[in-house]
Amino acid sequence: MALILNEEQQSLKDIAKEFLQKNAPVTHFREIRDTENELGYDEKLWKDMVDLGWSGILVPEEYGGFDFGMVGMGSIFEEMGKMLTPSPLFATGVLGASLITLGGSNSQKQNYLPQIVDGSIT
């Protein structure tokens, strides 16, 4: 079954594709792998992803996010998969953000969700 993206989702996918082709080609993954990067990802690339708003896609707007949904996030991951892009986006922007949004206390949401959006925690 083909997924039909709306205009905003398609735009996000196109931006992700262009950004990742330019900044994170497969050779970039190999460099990180071969240098045995302790983090397992490029900190500058992660900061750029945060600046594009990717870390806040699933975070509700009231906490500084975009509440854009799983389809939007999925379109980014599709492009990341094509480039073998290592990043903390899944662990932080999907798992962390979703768990806190769905099961966190108000205090936890107020404390952690803005930090996920601004990239200060991973």
Name these PLM-found stretches.
Residues 24-122:
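Glycine-rich flavin
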Residues 2-25, 54, 62-63:
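Flavin-dependent oxidoreductase catalytic core characteristic
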